[in-house]
Amino acid sequence: MAKELRFGDDARLQMLAGVNALADAVQVTMGPRGRNVVLEKSYGAPTVTKDGVSVAKEIEFEHRFMNMGAQMVKEVASKTSDTAGDGTTTATVLARSILVEGHKAVAAGMNPMDLKRGIDKAVLAVTKKLQAMSKPCKDSKAIAQVGTISANSDEAIGAIIAEAMEKVGKEGVITVEDGNGLENELYVVEGMQFDRGYISPYFINNQQNMSCELEHPFILLVDKKVSSIREMLSVLEGVAKSGRPLLIIAEDVEGEALATLVVNNMRGIVKVCAVKAPGFGDRRKAMLQDIAILTKGQVISEEIGKSLEGATLEDLGSAKRIVVTKENTTIIDGEGKATEINARIAQIRAQMEETTSDYDREKLQERVAKLAGGVAVIKVGAATEVEMKEKKARVEDALHATRAAVEEGIVAGGGVALIRAQKALDSLKGDNDDQNMGINILRRAIESPMRQIVTNAGYEASVVVNKVAEHKDNYGFNAATGEYGDMVEMGILDPTKVTRMALQNAASVASLMLTTECMVADLPKKEEGVGAGDMGGMGGMGGMGGMM
């Protein structure tokens, strides 16, 4: 395949054109007065969004060199979204600003490598300053404020996320689903829940809810299929004498064993329910072990030399209450020791650090949440499907932002934290003039998020930035109301992690682009038209008339 090459300033200008076009589309969504962007879909209604990364992902240019620039900035937005969950527009605006200022310096004859070194030094200083300014985000009010800002000033979303976090804890799993009504709803599942229901409907003892409810039951955990009742006789006799109910969690219960359990349950000899173990393969073994630790039981597995025939009441777990429906089993208040549960959580966390698969990490996080006690489901309500998609994306953004805030703390929002962090650059000096220029490029660039927020709100950016820079601490400009004041008191907060990741990712890609000296792309293919004259040979088919 033939290639096209561009060098030096020509290459950088082409990249800059792509970056500018992408940033122009993304930056209109920034801040409380940001505008919507409508995205065409190949099927169905168009999507309306105010989410920077959604806009960035849709953009692709026909011009290959422009597209390369745009794709690199798209990577900034995606990486910031993946690691911090928010701050995609901030990252895009910062990357464009660093690149524009840097390109002017390179065009004036400065050394791109020294500019990059200066920018890197400045980013390090600003990051340290941001972390020093950061305050821990502990109370529900602060969590709600972070969620509200990230959800484009929708207080209902901020409040429901704060409520969910309060109920399931910082480690709990919060999932977002489509609702059926117009209002957002929150459902909280206390205790450990897994997606397996009763094997037979004959175990139901609450006809009203179509569920099986067991009070203070024993729990038998078996890592194999159970088909013979003989294996379980000693355990069943012990349970019958105790007068307590029994929940059996096994790979499967079938045939004679299932029939006998159903008959005993219906006659009232042993109150019992059987469910299949959650998960598959190694994950099933791990989840059975989780349940064992949560309920102070023992998994009956031939791998560790324990047989079902030799099982005793000491091997069984216990819980305060268990509810089994057609699709789910919920274990409430397992009797496991807190120290053992915490050790298990720490062990799973260590696995999360090591895994490279996002899917595995998500499943491990779910196991942590189930052990820590709680899963919350936010059902998003909306009038139309278009609104539902847009609102659901905002709830997910806000959820990521609040998690980031809990992790690394919060700083004043609205671009104020970056303006305050400029102080860290006052005493910073590079090894030469070109590095000093790199530091100054970043000094100007970190004003750009506030400038864009103010511009989108219809105010004069330079006036606002200068006024905010004259003051100290959390003093800033509320673009939603047009008022100046303490940003923290007004509830305008940003997670430190989001601001930090946006700056680091933007500077990383922008300085890479500044040091680009050559670009290589495929030449566009020339479309070869099919000659219509070739069809002339078909005329010979006229002789087929004789076939009639």
From Swiss-Prot:
<keyword id="KW-0963">Cytoplasm</keyword>
<dbReference type="InterPro" id="IPR027413">
    <property type="entry name" value="GROEL-like_equatorial_sf"/>
</dbReference>
<comment type="similarity">
    <text>Belongs to the chaperonin (HSP60) family.</text>
</comment>
<dbReference type="GO" id="GO:0016853">
    <property type="term" value="F:isomerase activity"/>
</dbReference>
<dbReference type="GO" id="GO:0140662">
    <property type="term" value="F:ATP-dependent protein folding chaperone"/>
</dbReference>
<feature type="binding site">
    <location>
        <position position="414"/>
    </location>
    <ligand>
        <name>ATP</name>
    </ligand>
</feature>
<comment type="function">
    <text>May play a protective role against the defense mechanisms generated by the infected macrophages.</text>
</comment>
<feature type="binding site">
    <location>
        <begin position="478"/>
        <end position="480"/>
    </location>
    <ligand>
        <name>ATP</name>
    </ligand>
</feature>
<feature type="binding site">
    <location>
        <begin position="86"/>
        <end position="90"/>
    </location>
    <ligand>
        <name>ATP</name>
    </ligand>
</feature>
<dbReference type="InterPro" id="IPR002423">
    <property type="entry name" value="Cpn60/GroEL/TCP-1"/>
</dbReference>
<dbReference type="GO" id="GO:0051082">
    <property type="term" value="F:unfolded protein binding"/>
</dbReference>
<dbReference type="InterPro" id="IPR027410">
    <property type="entry name" value="TCP-1-like_intermed_sf"/>
</dbReference>
<feature type="binding site">
    <location>
        <position position="50"/>
    </location>
    <ligand>
        <name>ATP</name>
    </ligand>
</feature>
<protein>
    <recommendedName>
        <fullName>Chaperonin GroEL</fullName>
        <ecNumber>5.6.1.7</ecNumber>
    </recommendedName>
</protein>
<dbReference type="InterPro" id="IPR001844">
    <property type="entry name" value="Cpn60/GroEL"/>
</dbReference>
<feature type="binding site">
    <location>
        <position position="494"/>
    </location>
    <ligand>
        <name>ATP</name>
    </ligand>
</feature>
<dbReference type="GO" id="GO:0005524">
    <property type="term" value="F:ATP binding"/>
</dbReference>
<dbReference type="Pfam" id="PF00118">
    <property type="entry name" value="Cpn60_TCP1"/>
</dbReference>
<keyword id="KW-0413">Isomerase</keyword>
<keyword id="KW-0067">ATP-binding</keyword>
<keyword id="KW-0346">Stress response</keyword>
<dbReference type="GO" id="GO:0005737">
    <property type="term" value="C:cytoplasm"/>
</dbReference>
<keyword id="KW-0547">Nucleotide-binding</keyword>
<comment type="subunit">
    <text>Forms a cylinder of 14 subunits composed of two heptameric rings stacked back-to-back. Interacts with the co-chaperonin GroES.</text>
</comment>
<dbReference type="InterPro" id="IPR027409">
    <property type="entry name" value="GroEL-like_apical_dom_sf"/>
</dbReference>
<feature type="binding site">
    <location>
        <begin position="29"/>
        <end position="32"/>
    </location>
    <ligand>
        <name>ATP</name>
    </ligand>
</feature>
<comment type="function">
    <text>Together with its co-chaperonin GroES, plays an essential role in assisting protein folding. The GroEL-GroES system forms a nano-cage that allows encapsulation of the non-native substrate proteins and provides a physical environment optimized to promote and accelerate protein folding.</text>
</comment>
<dbReference type="InterPro" id="IPR018370">
    <property type="entry name" value="Chaperonin_Cpn60_CS"/>
</dbReference>
<dbReference type="GO" id="GO:0042026">
    <property type="term" value="P:protein refolding"/>
</dbReference>
<keyword id="KW-0143">Chaperone</keyword>
